[in-house]
Every structure is written in structure tokens, then in C-alpha cells.
Amino acid sequence: MTSDQNIKVDDVKLDGVCLFLAAYLSWARQFRVFATRMPLIAYRGHACGTWKLVPSLCRNRESYNIRLLKQYEDEVIREFRNRFKLSDYTDIEVLAYARHHGAPTRLLDWSSNPFVGLWFAVSDKTHDSVSGVIFQLIAGDSDLVSPRMGNFKLEHAENCGCKKPIHIFSSPSKIERTERQQSIFTIASLNDGCVIKPLDEVGLPQQKMPVRKFLVPAALKLELRRTLAELGLDAYGIYGSADAFGETLSALFDLSDFNVSSEIISCAKTHSPTAE
């Protein structure tokens, strides 16, 4: 390597996407855990920054009786168990399987990988005109969130000795997409109507839910999506199905709205995008 190929960080020019990624990773790494598989930190991306952290079963159902929501949940479990031969799955495993396939459940799906969270915030081009958001949940020493390992059961959500309203657990390894998405789930208790509240609003004023968020500018979504695809984070990388591979190819060949950012920012003069 010749001397003119040896460059320093300050010599590198960053465009808007690289600046965003550097700021986002720096923000995410403010909280880190080592040497454990306990689900202590999780990321979830929303294509629209105004969407609430409410599970699909409970959206727009604030007036529903909790008993009715439980009946819906039982029906989802029964239908998936019978239709897809999941007799050896526990109830919570069936719910995780159903959630990965789009069924309404009271699970919120997260990832231990901050870039998977980012992918979900930018993957849907129909929302490119609005800013997205990535949520970070830090469960370490929270009075409201209980990290669970091993044999977590559905009934623990309501009848657990910890008395916490939110439980967080890793997606069961037998579910195909678990490894691809590095999946984590949260489940809210049916007690006191916690399940119909946005997760970041659960608790009392003196017990704040440990959730932060990082905004994704609408102007960067397209280029972020293509940059993540170059790193293997695309529909096929996330879902692994033939349909997802077709979606990935369609996105790869579609250049109709592609416009590379011309903004160049010195690495020595960077500033952080909006984080909360």
C-alpha cells in the first residue's frame, strides 16, 4: 500500500447517510451488555414516527373488554396450533410463531440488533414521505420490565412472582425467523389494562418505562434502505422466504426514485441527528 492510500479519520468525508449511521450506532451503544444471552436491550423500528407501541391485537381497541381480548388470543393460538400442526408448541411459542407470520397478538416484536430495528423503520417505501423512529428498550434494572430466560410460559405474564407488567423474552429457537431477525418479544400483562396502553406509557410517574427513541428523517429512508441491502439487510435477509427474495429483487432493480445524496460533511464537523 502506498503512502497516499493511508488516510486518517479526519480525512474522510461523510455524506448524510454515513453521518446518520455513525450517530445512530453511537446512540445505540450508550447502553451495552456483554457475556450474556439475556434479552436486556431491544430495538424496534416504526416506519411512521407517530405510531404507538401497542401490540397488533390491541390497536384501536381501548374500549374492548380485556376478557374479549383474551378470547381473541385463545382463538389465535387454537387456529395456528391446529392449522399448522404445532401440537408440540407451548402457547407462548404458538403466539411467537403467529406474530412472525402477521397474526394479531399481544406480543411486540423487537430485535437485539440495532440495524434490524433500523431496517423495519425504513423498509416500507410507501412511508418514505414521513419520518420513522427506532425505539430502544433497556430492561436491565427496570421496576417495570422482567427479562426472562428459558421456560417462559404465557401464564407468567399475569401470574409471576416479580409482579412486573411487562416481560421480555427471546424468540423460541424453533421458529425459523428467530436467528435471522435476532428476535425478542415483549408481552404486556392483561392485569389493570396494561396490554392496551402504549408500552412506553405503562407505569406511574415515578416508574418511567426505560424506552428511548431515535428519529429517522424521511429524506434519508431510500438511501438507508439501499445501504442496509448492501450489508445483507433486505427482505430476504430478514424473512428468508421465496416471496421475500422476489421482493428483494424487485427493490434491487427499481431505480425509479433513486437520487444519491450530494451532501458531504467533514468527519471532524459532525453533529448528531435527533434522539430522545
List each model region and its residues.
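Catalytic-core elements of nucleic-acid end-processing and repair enzymes
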Residues: 1-276
